């Protein structure tokens, strides 16, 4: 789940536009507790705002053994911010966006630092994406183990490219514009069968 909490964070609180209520970090943590108790959620991205470091520390302490807590806005692929998170115990995973930090050297440095401290890495697109396959190569080459991408053509191009390099692929993706989830079973990468790409409506 990508909460993008920075989008509705202000002065250490969070505005839920559905009813105009303001919630604390603890309130959101309790909501996440309900979600993971009732649904098979294994990863939450940007669960709190990028400046809510104390909240992130609390969230991580509470859910570290149950959830992958991914910092995107929190870290912005920046090693200085990642080191701050490591020192504070904030998050346990980082979203890696090569074209956000600006160079391959800085991308590699971020992955190395994360791995040295037991943080998981998720190679990622940014908000707009093409069929370019560079992040697929980086995901395999740097051994991130996870990749995040969107849009059907973009997804397929990266799956095909991953199939050239990886041994096995497990893909979990976002919803498309029609509200459908694009999913893929675990498959052996060699000779990926595109018929395994499937759509499943969520009621």
Feature roles, as predicted:
Residues 1-152:
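Catalytic core of soluble alpha/beta enzymes
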Residues 153-203:
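Toprim catalytic domain recognition across nucleic-acid enzymes
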């Amino acid at each position: 789940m990508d909460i993008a909490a920075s989008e509705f964070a202000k002065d250490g609180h969070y505005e839920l536009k559905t009813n105009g209520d303001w919630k604390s970090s603890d309130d959101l943590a309790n909501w996440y507790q309900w979600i993971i108790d009732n649904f098979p959620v294994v990863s939450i991205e940007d669960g709190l705002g990028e400046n809510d470091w104390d909240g992130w520390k609390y969230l991580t302490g509470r859910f570290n053994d149950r959830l992958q807590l991914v910092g995107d806005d929190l870290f912005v692929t920046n090693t200085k911010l990642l080191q701050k998170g490591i020192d504070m115990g904030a998050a346990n995973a980082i979203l890696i966006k090569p074209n956000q930090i600006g160079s391959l050297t800085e991308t590699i440095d971020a992955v190395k630092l994360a791995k040295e401290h037991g943080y998981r890495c998720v190679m990622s697109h940014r908000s707009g994406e093409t069929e370019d396959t560079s992040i697929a190569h980086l995901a395999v080459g740097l051994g991130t183990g996870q990749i995040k991408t969107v849009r059907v053509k973009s997804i397929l191009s990266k799956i095909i490219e991953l199939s050239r390099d990886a041994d096995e692929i497990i893909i979990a993706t976002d919803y498309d514009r029609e509200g459908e989830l694009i999913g893929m079973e675990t498959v052996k990468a060699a000779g990926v069968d595109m018929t395994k790409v499937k759509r499943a409506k969520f009621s």
